[in-house]
């Protein structure tokens, strides 16, 4: 019976295949609509520049009658589909740019009414303001913090400066001494009147934090209203992005998160618990995190590493030791003097995940003369530490202002003696004097910053220093990891500079790894 059914199915299939096709087809070449006179991209200043376009339109159909549509939509949208706003229904466009400073796509649709055929032209449009491109400097006067902006209209080297922008626009400085600057490209706010993604600069201090609309530099929230619940402690604060579009807030050793792929209004949730007993903890200001990773923290109370995966949950996740680790990730009796991220490596199939390498400098709580340099290999919620003991013979032993070169040479930079910049090769422990700031200056930070934007690319070692109530930030090129030549530029202003960050319309969380 089974064979009979198979035979009948084959016969039916053959009869169907032999059915004559009486449909009518037109095999002539399809219509082609050509549009000329539109550039491949545009960069325009909001409320100042007009987008004036007079395209040439033609068709291979001789009797074509066209109708037109100009529209624009935002590229950086999460949680909903992009919405096309109609600008005009004419062949030409003369439109005053009013959109917020961010990435947009201009759409030009030409339709032949005779045939119904349409041609679409999609063009990236970067909308900027004076505030949306340049080097931002977080600085303080010892008790209050502010922002300076060094303008870069045509290249990465600044040509102008705007001082004390935060206070001049918002009416007052931010309390406390400045900490890290960070940037969030998909932070939610209602600054435009409706809830949506807002490109946001975050200024943090040891007493407060402010989310700031890059479009206008007006503050959105400060610590008083940045949390759903009023904070019981105020500072030290810092905000940074993590994997899964999560944002993290450290405040007074506690951590809060926003899961940004879910509905939110730009406010951070409740304090993460350490365990079911709500055991007290106090997280270090140092962390390991970027948009590819979980966020990893070190509890200074218990000397224990913890993690948060993609911002989710209500409690910190514990870390397991990998066999062969030189030091446990839990209760290791250490104080962290520095910690940061060195590299992220994607494992091929069947793993299909990222693993991370970080670095830390520890000091033993029982014997403060014992210091250790640790390489930290992280895979999910497991960790292996490989230790190198430091002695007085190592310059790093007395180092300060440490920083790592994420994704590049296996080097750590640090300052010594207040005015010397040193590097340490983490592969062979070789230490090298890289630069000495002039007499009287004191180094306040060292950073490695990179950017790949066309015409604005940079790969700098940046050294901040202070003298007589003013700051200097020297920006150096590097060769094989070492400082190369004289500074490309030196930024100067009043106060003490604590951090620097480059912002442009193309910058996002993935282009900046925020760390000390």
Region spans (language model):
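Sec-dependent signal peptide recognition
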Residues: 2-9
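Conserved blade-ending motifs and adjacent loop-strand segments that build the rim/top face
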Residues: 387-400, 431-454, 482-501
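Preference for solvent-exposed, low-hydrophobicity sequence contexts
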Residues: 163-173, 179-181, 185-411, 428, ...
């Amino acid at each position: 019976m089974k064979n009979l059914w198979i035979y009948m199915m084959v016969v039916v299939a053959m009869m169907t295949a032999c059915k004559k096709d009486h449909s009518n087809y037109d095999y002539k070449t399809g219509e082609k609509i050509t549009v000329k006179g539109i550039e491949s991209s545009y960069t325009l200043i909001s409320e100042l520049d007009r987008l004036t376009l007079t395209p040439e339109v033609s068709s291979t159909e001789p009797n074509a009658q066209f109708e037109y549509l100009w529209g624009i939509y935002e590229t950086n949208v999460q949680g909903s589909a992009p919405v096309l706003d109609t600008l005009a229904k004419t062949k030409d466009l003369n439109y005053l740019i009013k959109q917020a400073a961010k990435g947009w796509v201009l759409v030009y649709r030409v339709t032949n009414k005779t045939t119904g055929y349409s041609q679409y032209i999609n063009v990236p449009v970067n909308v900027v303001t004076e505030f949306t491109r340049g080097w931002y400097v977080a600085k303080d006067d010892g008790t209050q913090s502010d922002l300076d902006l060094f303008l870069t209209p045509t290249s990465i080297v600044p040509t102008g400066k705007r001082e004390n922008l935060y206070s001049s626009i918002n009416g007052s400085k931010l309390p406390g001494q400045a900490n890290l600057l960070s940037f969030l490209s998909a932070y939610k706010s209602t600054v435009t009147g409706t809830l949506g993604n807002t490109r946001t600069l975050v200024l943090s201090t040891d007493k407060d934090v402010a989310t700031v609309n890059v479009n206008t530099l007006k503050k959105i929230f400060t610590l008083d209203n940045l949390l759903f619940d009023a904070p019981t402690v105020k500072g030290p604060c810092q905000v940074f992005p993590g994997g899964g579009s999560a944002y993290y807030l450290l405040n007074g050793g506690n951590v809060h998160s926003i899961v940004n792929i879910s509905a939110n209004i730009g406010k951070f949730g409740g304090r993460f618990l350490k365990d079911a007993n709500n055991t007290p903890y106090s997280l270090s200001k140092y962390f390991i995190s970027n948009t590819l990773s979980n966020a990893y923290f070190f509890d200074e109370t218990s000397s224990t590493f913890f993690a948060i995966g993609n911002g989710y949950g209500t409690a910190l996740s514990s870390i397991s030791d990998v066999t062969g680790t030189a030091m446990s990730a839990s209760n290791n009796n250490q104080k962290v003097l520095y910690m940061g991220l060195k590299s992220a490596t994607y494992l091929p199939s069947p793993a299909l995940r990222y693993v991370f390498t970080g670095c830390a400098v520890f000091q033993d709580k029982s014997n403060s003369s014992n210091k250790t340099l640790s390489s930290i290999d992280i895979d999910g919620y497991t960790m292996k530490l490989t230790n190198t003991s430091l002695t007085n013979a190592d310059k790093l032993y007395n180092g300060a202002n440490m920083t790592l070169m994420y994704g590049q040479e296996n080097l750590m930079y640090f300052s010594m003696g207040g005015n010397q910049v040193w590097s340490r090769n983490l592969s062979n422990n070789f230490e090298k004097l890289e630069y000495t700031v002039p007499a009287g200056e004191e180094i306040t930070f060292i950073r490695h910053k990179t950017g790949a934007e066309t015409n604005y690319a940079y790969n700098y070692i940046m050294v901040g220093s202070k003298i007589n109530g003013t700051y200097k930030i020297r920006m150096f090129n590097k060769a094989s990891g070492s400082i190369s030549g004289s500074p490309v530029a030196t930024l100067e202003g009043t106060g003490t500079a604590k951090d620097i960050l480059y912002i442009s319309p193309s910058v996002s969380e993935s282009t900046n790894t925020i760390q000390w």
